[in-house]
């Protein structure tokens, strides 16, 4: 089954797939698309990848994100996995290359997807047939319900005002018994992190910061079930069965 056939199996009926470049496809309309991160993809990666930035600003480490992604990847032996808002696969490329699962990784930024492709090639020599890179909009999900065994959405919710609407839509893409893995920055009384969250909110980078308790309540209200939830510094890590 080629890439187009694999994508048609999970995309909603009538959704048109376009091949943009080698190993990159799009489910967006055939119109010019400019995304905020197209202009800053390289700068974003160079900062966010560092131990110093994560430790100082958020009280975390890049290894925390890699470990969380690995937990999502090994949560099912072979089922299909969706990475929603995948960025450049900064913390996930090595995890996906080490897995045998089919992974569909989507982001609205074409430049981020190009960096994801380059990262996979640099680390693995090529983009495996089972890893599909798709340009798609998180605000307008184009996937069929019940098509994924695992869904990972890392570092997205703090940029998404309509999280209460998004979370159940993501959950609906999972098969019965599927697993949802989410991370988000939250305010929690940590001075440096909370101040920086406020700055990013005022500059329009993030939505209004949610507190750790607020996010936990939101997840429990929208998913309607027990959520495994923990915080490290300003980062919340949540897992839920659906």
Model regions and ranges:
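A short glycine-rich, Lys/Arg-flanked "PGG" loop and its adjoining helix->strand segment in the class I
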Residues: 164-176
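C-terminal alpha-helical "lid/dimerization" subdomain adjacent to the S-adenosyl-L-methionine
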Residues: 181-236
